[in-house]
Amino acid sequence: GLALSILIALAAICFALFSGEPYYVQVIIWVFTNAVLAVTLRFVLLIGELNIATAAFFGIGAYATAVASTIYDLPFFISLLAAPIIAGLISALFGWVTLRTKGPYFLLISFAFTEVVRLFYTKSEFLGGNSGMIGMFPPMALNDYFPAIAITILTAILLILYLTERSNLGRVFKAIQNNEDIPRSVGLNVIAL
């Protein structure tokens, strides 16, 4: 089961990285990037709510980096800092507004927010419209290290989320998933968590 899946994934990664084919390396980087998105969505599911807006926050971070790099001509590494800052602020605002809703209402709000963000990207000329933003290139010196950087980021996120899930906070998330009234009855502010 799981061990075989991990072994096959590691074999595919090694093949892609050592083949020397840029296409395979790019595919592996995209797989790791989407794995980060999948892992964060799974983490959000710990509280028992499906938050489709996770994809919107992912896109907001990507576009924040691209805008900082291409429009404002900030250095690449400074531009990378824009992603967590902008996406984090917008997600905190989104959570503050929507976390009082539950079930299908929360799902519909998160879906609507994601659609609004998508429409904003595709209809904004300064963001490239349907074609997206063009002209954001990382430093050439990093090209050979991108797979290692992607693996490191994914591993760090997996470790952080694994430890969080097994911490007291993770247990509180599971309690909220099972019955939100129980954590409230012992004085926990469910909305703040």
Predicted segments, located by residue:
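Transmembrane alpha-helices and adjacent helix-loop boundaries
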Residues: 1-193
